[in-house]
Curated annotation (Swiss-Prot):
SUPFAM superfamilies: Multidrug efflux transporter AcrB transmembrane domain (SSF82866). Gene3D superfamilies: Multidrug efflux transporter AcrB transmembrane domain (1.20.1640.10). Glycans are attached at N762. It is found in: Membrane. It comes from Homo sapiens (Human). This is Patched domain-containing protein 4. The gene is PTCHD4.
Amino acid sequence: MCFLRRPGAPASWIWWRMLRQVLRRGLQSFCHRLGLCVSRHPVFFLTVPAVLTITFGLSALNRFQPEGDLERLVAPSHSLAKIERSLASSLFPLDQSKSQLYSDLHTPGRYGRVILLSPTGDNILLQAEGILQTHRAVLEMKDGRNSFIGHQLGGVVEVPNSKDQRVKSARAIQITYYLQTYGSATQDLIGEKWENEFCKLIRKLQEEHQELQLYSLASFSLWRDFHKTSILARSKVLVSLVLILTTATLSSSMKDCLRSKPFLGLLGVLTVCISIITAAGIFFITDGKYNSTLLGIPFFAMGHGTKGVFELLSGWRRTKENLPFKDRIADAYSDVMVTYTMTSSLYFITFGMGASPFTNIEAVKVFCQNMCVSILLNYFYIFSFFGSCLVFAGQLEQNRYHSIFCCKIPSAEYLDRKPVWFQTVMSDGHQQTSHHETNPYQHHFIQHFLREHYNEWITNIYVKPFVVILYLIYASFSFMGCLQISDGANIINLLASDSPSVSYAMVQQKYFSNYSPVIGFYVYEPLEYWNSSVQDDLRRLCSGFTAVSWVEQYYQFLKVSNVSANNKSDFISVLQSSFLKKPEFQHFRNDIIFSKAGDESNIIASRLYLVARTSRDKQKEITEVLEKLRPLSLSKSIRFIVFNPSFVFMDHYSLSVTVPVLIAGFGVLLVLILTFFLVIHPLGNFWLILSVTSIELGVLGLMTLWNVDMDCISILCLIYTLNFAIDHCAPLLFTFVLATEHTRTQCIKSSLQDHGTAILQNVTSFLIGLVPLLFVPSNLTFTLFKCLLLTGGCTLLHCFVILPVFLTFFPPSKKHHKKKKRAKRKEREEIECIEIQENPDHVTTV
């Protein structure tokens, strides 16, 4: 190997170039030997993956277990809200609050909830008989203790000019029934049975009372409707597989019965399928629990795996036909597996970072762990199982066997004597091949379309201005969408869209969004409640809220009773002996914790209830309330915490859910920068960074405009977008920067001709496979469909429209290749002239 120093080039440039050449050729040599090994032992590399799939696949069926804790999956794992819940629960145990109206403070436990909605224009308050019948039927249910804790009104119309806010009419009533399970396993089973019967009863009552609309919710409803997505999607996933199999088979076919590879397209998709089954088996063997977010793994793995399949097929077509099939396999591996190894490594790095301890959402972490295993197995199965299939197909081609019927192809003379239909079925393309076209694979319909039609059109000088305008429009909409990103802390985004939970949530949002959930305000340190300055501080903290406070009620009681309690002993004495013994104030006993030291009593902790006035965007406003109250707990003299069960899901959710994609993006950027001087041409990495950034921001902005929130599913799709873009842009870009044609236009044509077929095959199969997801009635699958559709569409747009045009404007320049060729041609002409002068007879003979 010889390296010539370019005039004026520094020595470091020579060493970097040598290092890049050595690394590249080393990787190519390794992949070449790997291809030779597979071609010499195809049975072994076919058998081992099959045995692994059977072993782990059977174990997956035996160990399948769904995840039952939805909060563990989708709520931030490490949040202040969980610490606050523990503190609140230790101060005020849940079983002491079941008889309270405002008891939904720590965690609801087991409960049943129903909304009764009157027809449009009617007053629910006039439907008393139906309400009482529903309530009475619930109270008569057995197998569990219950307590009626009250009702709330929705869609309220007040009496005009009423000072005491009297209610004129209402559209809906909400009733909640709490069960006392006390943490016992037996009681919990009884509570679960009661909830099931409760939901059945509400459905039955709906049939009996057509004049009312009933919407029920129980504590297990969210988990049930979350898991329902997987049940609804089973048949659609199978349809997706059939569509991908069909697309891969058809796109791998040719008229040439010898060189057509329909079964290889089919076997390539099946290779990815069995690798996914093996990964699932490993997941369940390691005590993993299934959840509906894992529904995206087959689509993610298929998008990467089939890319390797189609690239290997394209690499096979680029090899020389006159070589033995084993050498052709080795050459295809040397050509394709270097890039595929790099992209698989980036998949592993990005999803590995998503599975790191920095990820605060358990569903994202579990998904990324499974994706890492799937990528490793995918890579192993592609070069082993599919490689063995390619070996057998190559052997059949070398021995001139039909690619479908596996019979000997007759000679041209024999075919000429047969009917046209027989010639069509058994033709190996000998009539189409001419001395001008030595590569029969050029007749593949996609490659023919790209070479003869598309390449000339996209590089036309009159098309380029329209492509630039198209990209500016694309960038504008993407930027506009990126400015409107909203977090997806609403758990409804992960549920089946036609489920009872979603119906209940929609009605609740419509009629009960005027007030926030009840927020517990916990004072966890002793406080001088009798001090006027402390009283003023409490009033300022509670200003802007509707407060249900024992402190305020006690102050009013003292004022009405004309009793003075300006010191500690009087304040506590009157509180215990008079205030808390009155029937209308007895429910405040559970809100105050007393301690006794000798004859002296102290208040060591207490709680108040706050309700905020909200609008339709209830969730966002509650998050703002939480963010405003927490800093006050540190800056004020009163030490307190605020808590509601919804805080567990909303606490820094936007930060928790965006961290994985930021880490993954940083990982990709870091890897590409670190390898900037190790790849064969640094400009390849530079263009790759720009392309991936453009695609990622495009998907992010467009999905926001398509009403997709930043929940755990969309974040996983954004991580996948990084890798999907690299997977498809990297071969195209590196082929372009290494091309030695005279002009950039010729280089991009050559790149599209080499890799355009594989890219188009894979993206088309990927997008067609997404179509059945559109028919799954689930918000989770809608999000998955939208994000992956944008991922495939933006990648296709960049590979076939934007990059082919922009690469003709910007570096790398191809002039030095042109100068080298001119110098060589001039040198050759001088040598020929010398030969002509010295040997004129020879020239005359020629």
